[in-house]
């Protein structure tokens, strides 16, 4: 899922993950773009169909409080989404974790925020991302897991920092928010 900042990549990928989880798939989520607790609040708001702003501010109607309580109970019952704290984790760490997990669907939000501890100092950022993208593709093929990945576009509307991202992906969905 590729788009410019603010175009809704994280929201769309979250909706895909929630749908997969509701269908009984185990989802493992690596939120590199936002803190773990913020991603959890977004999942809760979406599940409760409550505005994010209301949930963040704590100013909720009785109906919204009931919807949140129901969503918490539902999420506990159907705990098919696992958020993984990836603070300081490299691409190698994340890929090893995916390999060990029993999940069906993986969410990486977003690719350009991944770092590769095996990269040499002389490697360009484009080369590092091409390597990460290629390794992710091989991991998906080897494990049979679906890997949903968000990616930024540059100012020219191209996948930022590496053409390999589009070449390695099975499908690329370009997200464009119209004003």
Task: Pin down the residues of each PLM region.
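Phosphate-binding/switch loop-helix module in NTP-utilizing enzymes
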Residues: 80-142
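Conserved lysine of the Walker
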Residues: 9-10
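N-terminal cationic and glycine-rich segments that engage phosphates or anionic surfaces
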Residues: 16
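Cytosolic-facing regulatory segments adjacent to core modules
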Residues: 19-102, 116, 157, 166
């Amino acid at each position: 899922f590729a788009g410019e900042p603010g175009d809704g990549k994280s929201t769309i990928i979250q909706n895909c993950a929630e749908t997969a989880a509701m269908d009984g798939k185990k989802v493992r989520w690596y939120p590199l773009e936002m803190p773990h607790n913020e991603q959890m609040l977004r999942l809760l708001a979406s599940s409760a169909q409550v505005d994010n702003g209301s949930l963040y501010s704590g100013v909720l109607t009785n109906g919204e409080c009931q919807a949140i309580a129901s969503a918490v109970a539902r999420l506990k019952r159907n705990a098919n989404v696992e958020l993984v704290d990836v603070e300081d984790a490299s691409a190698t760490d994340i890929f090893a974790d995916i390999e060990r997990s029993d999940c069906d669907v993986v969410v990486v939000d977003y690719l350009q925020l991944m770092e590769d501890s095996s990269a040499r100092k002389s490697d360009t950022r484009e080369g590092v991302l091409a390597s990460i993208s290629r390794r992710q593709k091989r991991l998906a093929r080897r494990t049979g897991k679906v890997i949903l990945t968000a990616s930024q576009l540059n100012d020219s509307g191209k996948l930022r920092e590496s053409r390999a991202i589009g070449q390695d992906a099975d499908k690329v969905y370009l997200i464009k928010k119209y004003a």
